[in-house]
Amino acid sequence: MIRIITFIYDFLLILKAEIKRDYIFLKRYPLEIISFIFFMYIILLAVFFGFSQLTIGSVNLLNREKMIIGYCLMQFVLSTQMGWSGQIQNESQTGTLEQLSISGHTLGEVLLARGLAQLPRQIISFYVLLFLYKISISDLQISFNNNFYILLNMLIMAIGIFGVSYIFAGVTLLFKRVGFFFQIINFAFLGLFWQDRSKLTNGTLVAALYDNFPLTMGMANLQKILINQYVELNFSELQMLQFTVNSLLFAILGYYLFNLMEKKARTLGLLSQY
């Protein structure tokens, strides 16, 4: 019991340090965050403009709401992942990665604390980006009337994203400069978010993976919450429990794979040199 209390206390100290670290980062480099949101905002607007020019009068046939929600979620996944693997890449260059690896805490604990510390900022970024599209695109059927369910789904979804981030961080430990490769994967997630579930055949492996992947489960829930055409929210306790369990299992799998890759990196001496 004492050991558990000590572990929780130590983890809270790490979390406090990471929150302070993130605050200092925001205070010193505010333009980096602002410019990231701005350029992410501009990119999708350019996509819509391109569609409107190529198919005059047919842009309304697009499911703009689903595209925008999926795109904002992709930004949420991207910023979360970069907070883990991107920082490992930077620390391997500055020499601070070795200090983390020989501290009294495991790298996995430090990364988890870092992810939790940055999560409020990333949720705010999601809201800001979605709100910008809401006010700049006419007749957009997106509503913020159910913020409790929005936040609940994003928090549960974040657990699954942490699993993805652990895997990306482990690959970064082994190969270091892999940022461009991960950006391609993040845009592949965008394809998943934009996928029409009705076009997948029930009972197939692809459909089963789509229905149980935490990121696509979160996307499906957010569509029901945010898009006005869904008048009633029909979330059963069983559905939310399945969503939570799947996210936890994915996070545990990601943590396990990260530990394997961290041990391999230690064996190869990759934590002490770039």
Residue ranges and their predicted role:
Residues 1-274:
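Hydrophobic transmembrane alpha-helices and immediately adjacent juxtamembrane helices
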